A protein has these predicted regions:
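Acidic, proline/glycine-enriched N-terminal capping motif
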Residues: 1-129
C-alpha cells in the first residue's frame, strides 16, 4: 500500500530563521506543512494499521516527485516528511530504532509534485534474534 502526500517537499534544514531566541522553519516548510497536514491526518489510521504488520525498524520507501529540476539531497526533504510522520502519529520516532528509510529514484513532474510513502517488507524481519 502506498500513500501520496502532494506538494513540493522542502528541506526543513535549509532556510531556518533565527528569531533571537530559537530557530523557526522557513516559509516554504511552513506553507508545505499547512497544506500537507490534512493528508497526514486522513491517512493516519490506514498507515498505522499497515505498520502494525511489520517489525521495527520499519523499512519505509520515499519516492519524491519533484516540481523543479533543482539539485537536492534526498535526506533533506526526507527529514521534513519523517518529522511530519512523527508529528501526526504515523511513527513513534524517526530514529534508527523505528525507521529504516529507503529512497526510490526521484521523478520530475512540474504539475504534480509530492512524495509517495510505502512500507516495504524488511528481509531481516524473521532473522532478528
Amino acid at each position: 500500500m502506498k500513500w501520496f502526500i502532494p506538494g513540493s517537499v522542502p528541506s526543513s534544514k535549509n532556510g531556518r530563521r533565527w528569531t533571537g531566541k530559537y530557530f523557526i522553519a522557513s516559509k516554504a516548510v511552513m506553507n508545505y506543512r499547512k497544506k500537507a497536514k490534512d493528508y497526514y491526518a486522513k491517512y493516519h489510521d490506514e498507515f498505522k494499521a499497515e505498520l502494525a504488520k511489520h517489525d521495527l525498524p520499519a523499512k519505509i520507501s520515499f519516492e519524491f516527485i519533484r516540481g523543479t529540476r533543482h539539485k537536492f539531497d534526498y535526506i533533506n526533504p526526507a527529514q521534513t516528511v519523517q518529522d511530519d510522520m512523527v508529528k501526526f502519529g504515523w511513527i513513534e520516532d524517526d530514529n534508527a530504532e523505528f525507521i529504516l528509510p529507503v529512497f526510490e529514484q526521484y521523478i520530475y513532474d512540474k504539475e504534480n509534485p509530492g512524495v509517495w510513502i510505502e512500507i516495504l517488507n524488511n528481509e531481516k524481519e524473521n532473522n532478528n534474534n
